[in-house]
Amino acid sequence: MDCIKMNRVEQMKMVQGTALELFTRKNADYGDAFAKYGVIGVLMRIEDKIQRSLSITKNGVNLVSDEGIRDTLLDLHNYAAMALMLIDEE
């Protein structure tokens, strides 16, 4: 895949498609567990992921070997969407 030759809209569609696949898999495993603590709970998970991404990029430290920066950013994408879903339900 040569993302440089794609326009940004196509790139966004690919990122969102990948994130949706990830959300679908995790939602099958965890259900709506993210809703248990509401928006605040999701924001706390976002903070965890931000700290993780900073650790990976600034220090080169990746304690979870099967989750790199791309995986962490996809999780951030999904957590932001989950927070929006909860806000929309209010």
Where are these regions (language model features)?
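Intrinsically disordered, low-complexity regulatory regions
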Residues: 1-90
